């Protein structure tokens, strides 16, 4: 009986003699070791399931288990992360060396809060604001406790969407991260949490406090689960 592994074209063949290491699969274990070593020698990054050996039918089912991983790898190579501002003081957990992003195929564009503030001010009086305000009113319903702030929130949402379209370049997907405090509320005149949530629901993950790895994690979770994270 021949059993196929998911690693390239390597075959893991059951030892017909029965004189093997474990459960009649000594040759299969040896084949997996050699396949793994060959991949490493060639610097090929491969996914090996916890139980990588099976019949043709079983391996076909394993491919479905690999689909979320494949989606994530493809999507990461089409992702651009856009950040605004340095991480806040003492938010050491938000430290994100960008070299690791490039190592997995992700691009990043780092901007200052001042860049975002300038773009926001340029969107004052934008003709699209009333339509977004109406959307927000319908979405919030009885939870609309601060209706006077909705025009600014709509202005901010439009600002971010325009920035994404103008800066994503050849990348298909964008994830955002920015600061929420302490100066944001006093200078912009609102907190951005609601807009962040709306954009995330629309397929643009947003994290706060310039948590670059955080928004990356949100994006991966969205791609893998095919749902909002």
Each model region followed by its residue ranges:
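Active-site loops and adjacent core secondary-structure elements that bind or stabilize anionic groups
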Residues: 11-12, 135-161, 165-166, 170
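Short loop/turn segments at strand-loop or loop-helix junctions that form parts
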Residues: 13-16, 179-181
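Single conserved hydrophobic/aromatic residue that forms the stacking wall/gate
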Residues: 2-8, 12
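Structural motif
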Residues: 1, 84-88, 180
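Beta-sheet entry/capping signal
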Residues: 10, 45, 80, 107-108, ...
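Cap/lid and interdomain-hinge subdomains that line or gate substrate/regulatory clefts
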Residues: 16-144
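Anaerobic metallocofactor- and corrinoid-dependent redox/one-carbon enzyme cores
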Residues: 28, 90, 100-103, 153-229
């Amino acid at each position: 009986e021949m059993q196929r592994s998911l690693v390239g074209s390597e075959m893991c063949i059951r030892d017909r003699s029965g004189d093997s290491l474990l459960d009649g699969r000594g040759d299969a274990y040896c084949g997996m070791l050699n396949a793994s070593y060959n991949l490493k020698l060639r610097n090929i990054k491969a996914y090996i399931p916890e139980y990588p050996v099976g019949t043709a039918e079983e391996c076909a089912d394993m491919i479905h288990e690999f689909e979320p991983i494949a989606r994530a790898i493809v999507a990461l190579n089409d992702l651009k992360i856009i950040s605004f501002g340095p991480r806040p003081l003492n938010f050491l957990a938000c430290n994100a060396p960008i070299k690791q992003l490039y190592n997995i195929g992700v691009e990043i564009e780092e901007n200052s809060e001042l860049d975002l503030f300038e773009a926001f001010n340029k969107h004052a009086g934008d003709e699209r604001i009333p339509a977004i305000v109406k959307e927000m009113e319908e979405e919030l319903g009885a939870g609309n406790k601060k209706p006077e702030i909705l025009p600014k929130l709509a202005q901010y949402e439009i600002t971010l969407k325009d920035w994404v379209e103008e800066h994503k370049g050849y990348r298909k997907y964008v994830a955002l991260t920015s600061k929420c405090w302490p100066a944001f509320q006093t200078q912009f005149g609102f907190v951005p949490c609601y807009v962040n949530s709306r954009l995330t629901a629309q397929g643009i993950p947003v994290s706060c406090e310039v948590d670059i790895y955080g928004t990356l994690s949100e994006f991966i979770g969205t791609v893998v689960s095919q749902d909002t994270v």
